[in-house]
C-alpha cells in the first residue's frame, strides 16, 4: 500500500468520523429554531395588532371631517407621486441593467 492510498483512506475515515459525530446531535436543537421564529412572529403580530387598535381608537376619538378630507387628499397625492417616482426608478434600474446598446 502506498502512502497516497493510506492518506486517502485516513481522510475518508476522518470525514466519516465527523459525520457520525454530527449525527449524534439532539433533535431538540433543530426544532428550537422554528419555535423561536414562531414566537417572534407571534409577538410581532400582537404588537402590530395592538398598535393598529390604538391608532384606530385614537382616530375614532379625534375624528374631524375636515382633517379626514385633508388626510385622504394627502394620501392620494402622495400615492400618485410615489407611483411616478417608482416608475422613474424602475426605468433607471432597467437602463443600468441593460447597459448602453
UniProtKB/Swiss-Prot annotation:
Description of post-translational modifications: Proapolipoprotein C-II is synthesized as a sialic acid containing glycoprotein which is subsequently desialylated prior to its proteolytic processing. Proapolipoprotein C-II, the major form found in plasma undergoes proteolytic cleavage of its N-terminal hexapeptide to generate apolipoprotein C-II, which occurs as the minor form in plasma.
Region (Lipid binding), start-end ranges: 66-74
Name of this chain's protein: Apolipoprotein C-II
Role noted for this protein: Component of chylomicrons, very low-density lipoproteins (VLDL), low-density lipoproteins (LDL), and high-density lipoproteins (HDL) in plasma. Plays an important role in lipoprotein metabolism as an activator of lipoprotein lipase. Both proapolipoprotein C-II and apolipoprotein C-II can activate lipoprotein lipase.
UniProt-recorded Gene Ontology molecular function terms: phospholipase activator activity; phospholipase binding
Keyword Glycoprotein applies: yes
Secretion signal span: 1-22
Single biological process term from Gene Ontology: lipid transport
Keywords of this entry: Chylomicron, Glycoprotein, HDL, LDL, Lipid degradation, Lipid metabolism, Lipid transport, Secreted, Sialic acid, Signal, Transport, VLDL
InterPro entries: Apo-CII (IPR008019), ApoC-II_dom_sf (IPR023121)
Entry similarity comment: Belongs to the apolipoprotein C2 family.
Stretches for region Lipoprotein lipase cofactor: 78-101
Gene Ontology CC: chylomicron; high-density lipoprotein particle; low-density lipoprotein particle; very-low-density lipoprotein particle
Organism: Plecturocebus moloch (Dusky titi monkey)
Subcellular compartments: Secreted
Pfam families, sorted: Apo-CII
Amino acid at each position: 500500500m502506498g502512502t497516497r492510498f493510506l492518506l486517502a483512506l485516513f481522510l475518508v475515515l476522518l470525514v466519516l468520523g465527523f459525520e457520525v459525530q454530527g449525527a449524534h446531535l439532539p433533535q431538540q436543537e433543530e426544532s428550537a429554531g422554528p419555535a423561536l421564529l414562531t414566537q417572534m412572529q407571534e409577538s410581532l403580530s400582537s404588537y402590530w395588532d395592538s398598535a393598529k387598535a390604538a391608532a384606530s381608537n385614537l382616530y375614532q376619538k379625534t375624528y374631524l371631517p375636515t382633517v379626514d378630507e385633508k388626510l385622504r387628499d394627502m394620501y392620494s397625492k402622495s400615492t400618485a407621486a410615489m407611483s411616478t417616482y417608482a416608475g422613474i426608478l424602475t426605468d433607471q434600474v432597467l437602463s443600468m441593467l441593460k447597459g448602453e446598446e
